[in-house]
Amino acid sequence: MEISTPDFGFGTEDSSAQQSANRAIPQPVPAPAFPLKETASDTGGTAPTFGTLQDNINELCLRYQTVCSEGRDGTGGGGPPGGGIRKDAFADAVQRARQIAAKIGGDAATTVNNSTPDFGFGGQKRQLEDGDQPESKKLAAQGDCEYGPRGGAPAAPPERSGPVGDPPGPPRAERGRRPPPALTGGALPSAALPPQLGPMHPPPRSTTVTEEYRVPDGMVGLIIGRGGEQINKIQQDSGCKVQISPDSGGLPERSVSLTGSPEAVQKAKLMLDDIVSRGRGGPPGQFHDYANGQNGTVQEIMIPAGKAGLVIGKGGETIKQLQERAGVKMIFIQDGSQNTNVDKPLRIIGDPYKVQQACEMVMDILRERDQGGFGDRNEYGSRIGGGIDVPVPRHSVGVVIGRSGEMIKKIQNDAGVRIQFKQDDGTGPEKIAHIMGPPERCEHAARIINDLLQSLRSGPPGPPGHGMPPGGRGRGRGQGIWGPPGGEMTFSIPTHKCGLVIGRGGENVKAINQQRGAFVEISRQLPPNGDPNFKLFIIRGSPQQIEHAKQPIEEKIEGPLCPVGPGPGPGGPPGPAGPMGPFNPGPFNQGPPGGPPPHQYPPQGWGNTYPQWQPPAPHDPSKAAAAADPNAAWAGYYSHYYQQPPGPVPGQPPAPTAPPVQGEPPQPPPTGQSDYTKAWEEYYKKIGQQPQQPGAPPQQDYTKAWEEYYKKQAAQVATGGGPGAPPGPQPDYSAAWAEYYRQQAAYYGQTPGAAGPAPPPTQQGQQAQ
């Protein structure tokens, strides 16, 4: 018998009670194969799954089966079967199914119209027949019932048990995929759902990107920082992993790998750009808290290799003063494995104008070092910070300091200044003595130092000739033949270093001649003392050319040149050589001064290495007579200097044109060499035969002057009259010589007996013999 299906009131809008009553009720659906149970989704526990949806659909079918059975028994009447309670139960089951579908499908559930009813969770899923899921899941996901069109015949009951299988009706290929009319009301709004069953949104996927970025190769050290401090801070602040390639491959830029989210990568790039901009001296960016929490402008300047010590100073004194004066913080960035011969970055942190001022101060220090004591300096050196810098040859620093600092202390006390030698890398030919104090006192101290250095380069003056100006200052620190007056310099070099000066095939000497404009050659003469361990070299040219030619030679022998001396002065006879030098051995350690010790030319204690600076002695009237006759002074000097038996007074030479015995020292043993007339004649002949160098000043011939000079001296001595003739016997200089050597012995810690040779005998005794 056919029973009309009651209308439950949740069909389409055109449905009426009469049509619902006339509708045939399908056969009852068998009970589900597994019992219904409450799931976690009913209590808001775990997230719903397709299995949960399957359970609720089974419950829905079971309740619908109950409704159909009651309607078939005739208990439903014309209204809804079971009254409002059953209708509410069925609607509740449908609502629960929709909620679970919305929970699983999220916002994918769509509202459909009446003409095309569909599940909210099925519109976006593909056909499951082609899926790769197991068969049981395919059936469970497809639904439990199929309903025919309204007004049609009731469908046959299903042949299989279990609500999850194929529902009764036509074959799968002919069946539509429409849900029951009660399920076509669309998805519930999310506001109507409980919080635990609200629409689910898939969590955003974490996107990680890797990007290659390039930075200047010279800025890699700044990016890494000391001990990796900088790069670690970049990674922590940006959340991006930063990896720098170990080598640039010779390219000006180095690759940097940035790994992280797009936002982190972008932030890391901004931080890298900011570091590079600061390293190039550009304006600071928004990331400026890089240097140990120091805010402000950060600028990096590169300090050339070997000059970092100038900026740091002794014990960090210079860099501390720079920081205090400029009000900034300075940090040297140096890796422990970094080569010491590469430039080092100096990081300056502070206010913009203070950083700029500090940079200028550092560059001033570097420029002063590059000038090396020359540049735009005045007579005594360039003025820096209210003082004066005086360049001192490196081999003469010990002379300025003196033994145990006696000389430099005396200069400081006399001038009222403070003198300090600047620290350097030790490669330059000079060292800078910085004088601090009032300007006029600094100039006075600089004048003393320059006079001291000049006295090292020049020997003490000889005695004045009678009626003529004083003789020229003897050059050099060793005994030997005097060179011509200007345009030439003779010096000795150890034999084992001559090859370094000459070079292979004479290439070094040729290069000096071409580049310096002077003419350098080796002399065939033996050294003055006949020592085979030394060779004589001659440099000819202008004074400037000679000075330029000396520099490469001193570099080759790693020491200063010791000139034998220039020619005699235009007035009187030249003074003898000063103390011996390191390459000019003499017969004894300390050479006598340029003349006997009358008050006009007091003895000065310039030693081999550390001199004793003495002020001029006061005027002594008792020695005035000794200064009246220069011939007597020369006689006493040469009798002691050459340690020879007393001979005739130098004012009575054997020949009128022969000068007194002065030139060559005796060959060992120093006896039996009393007549050097022929040697002097040969010397002056050579001078007259030497060709003039192009551009050199013309050499004067003093032969006739010397002849005339000694003729006058001989005539005065023979007649016993004339100015300057001694009224009686010649004065005795033994006491003066003894005092001179006592001073030297006291300075060098020697006993008076070991200071040197014995003083010469009295002139009276010499005349008596």
UniProtKB/Swiss-Prot annotation:
Feature: compositional bias, Pro residues: 196-205, 563-585, 645-671
InterPro entries on file: FUBP_C, KH-I_FUBP2_rpt1, KH-I_FUBP2_rpt2, KH-I_FUBP2_rpt3, KH-I_FUBP2_rpt4, KH_dom, KH_dom_type_1, KH_dom_type_1_sf
Region (Disordered): 1-48, 108-209, 456-490, 558-628, 644-769
Localization annotation: Nucleus; Cytoplasm
Domain (KH): residue spans on this chain: 208-272, 296-362, 385-449, 486-553
Pfam families the UniProt entry points to: FUBP_C, KH_1
CDD domains to which the protein is assigned, alphabetical: KH-I_FUBP2_rpt1, KH-I_FUBP2_rpt2, KH-I_FUBP2_rpt3, KH-I_FUBP2_rpt4
Molecular function as annotated in GO: mRNA 3'-UTR AU-rich region binding; mRNA 3'-UTR binding; mRNA binding
One Gene Ontology CC term in the entry: nucleus
Keyword Transport recorded: yes
GO biological process: 3'-UTR-mediated mRNA destabilization; cellular response to cytokine stimulus; intracellular mRNA localization; miRNA metabolic process; mRNA transport; negative regulation of nitric oxide biosynthetic process; positive regulation of mRNA catabolic process; regulation of mRNA stability
Stretches with biased composition (Gly residues): 468-486
Basic and acidic residues composition bias: residue spans: 126-138
Biased composition (Low complexity): 152-163, 743-756
UniProt main location, coarse: nucleus
Domain of life (superkingdom): Eukaryota
Keywords: Cytoplasm, mRNA transport, Nucleus, Repeat, RNA-binding, Transport
Gene3D superfamilies listed in its UniProt record: K Homology domain, type 1 (3.30.1370.10)
Biased composition (Polar residues): 13-22
Signal sequence, start to end: none
Role played: Part of a ternary complex that binds to the downstream control sequence (DCS) of the pre-mRNA. Mediates exon inclusion in transcripts that are subject to tissue-specific alternative splicing. May interact with single-stranded DNA from the far-upstream element (FUSE). May activate gene expression. Also involved in degradation of inherently unstable mRNAs that contain AU-rich elements (AREs) in their 3'-UTR, possibly by recruiting degradation machinery to ARE-containing mRNAs. Binds to the dendritic targeting element and may play a role in mRNA trafficking.
Family in the record: Belongs to the KHSRP family.
Protein name per Swiss-Prot or TrEMBL: Far upstream element-binding protein 2
Protein's organism: Gallus gallus
